């Protein structure tokens, strides 16, 4: 009888999952390494620790009509730059920031965060550095790291290259949701300074570096260019929640300045009948953006359409409360610029009038 090709044979070596490229022991070792990270971010509402099939979290007390707010995001190709420069310790902060800064725009308090880490070959040290950064981001935002997924997928990624995604859930009182409906003519726009490009525009940034063979050790405004480009995204959650919940300022809207810059993100929180008049001379653009524009010969409009240009969050408040809002935000550690005001929109004009551009 002829043996079929799929019949087991004692002459063949016994295969294991590790032979196929998946190291279960490495995954278990990572879980043990990061348990302390998760524990340090815990909130009273969290039930249980890492390792369960699902993570449990109660709603906080004190809400009459709690509304859950969710968000998911990644860090784009900033991740590629971080891997190329072997800087894995802060990219997790970026991941958290991109999610929680979106949640706080609705007025929501972030409750918990989960991450997804996918790689071709799990390097426990690299993964632990990344998750430690995620824990730091959660601590800055006041939310709990309650779970995640580590996927080792040989053949899907080159070597120890990895990809990241984050998922966050927050809560807001139904009557206090910020949705832009309160924005009115005469409101003032306050801009909160960014820490750098944050996590957007990195395909353009990497192209500029590649084309010019840039020396990433050169100093820009007193720090190496590599550090300026990889500065973690600023997390605005605590300062904004303090303004919303603990001050006498009525916040009308918030806008997280991500991909699309001021030109595309501010309109997302404006009624169709209103526009934002922003004075581009009201803040000094950080040196890293000037370097990018010069080295890439990037058009001014493109700069404001792709990069945050030094403004990471916009706060819209009544004109009579603008000074109090600015003082409160500065007391919370933010650098604040008075960008402009809300004006009537003329016909179908663009909703951001950027004046005094270079």
Curated annotation (Swiss-Prot):
Picking any one GO biological process from the record gives: 'de novo' IMP biosynthetic process
Kindly state which keywords UniProt assigns to this record, in alphabetical order: ATP-binding, Cytoplasm, Ligase, Nucleotide-binding, Purine biosynthesis
Which superkingdom does the taxonomy of this entry point to? Bacteria
Reaction catalyzed: 2-formamido-N(1)-(5-O-phospho-beta-D-ribosyl)acetamidine + ATP = 5-amino-1-(5-phospho-beta-D-ribosyl)imidazole + ADP + phosphate + H(+)
GO MF annotations, alphabetized: ATP binding; phosphoribosylamine-glycine ligase activity; phosphoribosylformylglycinamidine cyclo-ligase activity
Its main subcellular localisation, reduced to a broad class, is cytoplasm
Instruction: Give compartment(s).
Output: Cytoplasm
**Known pathway:** Purine metabolism; IMP biosynthesis via de novo pathway; 5-amino-1-(5-phospho-D-ribosyl)imidazole from N(2)-formyl-N(1)-(5-phospho-D-ribosyl)glycinamide: step 2/2
Identification of the protein by name: Phosphoribosylformylglycinamidine cyclo-ligase
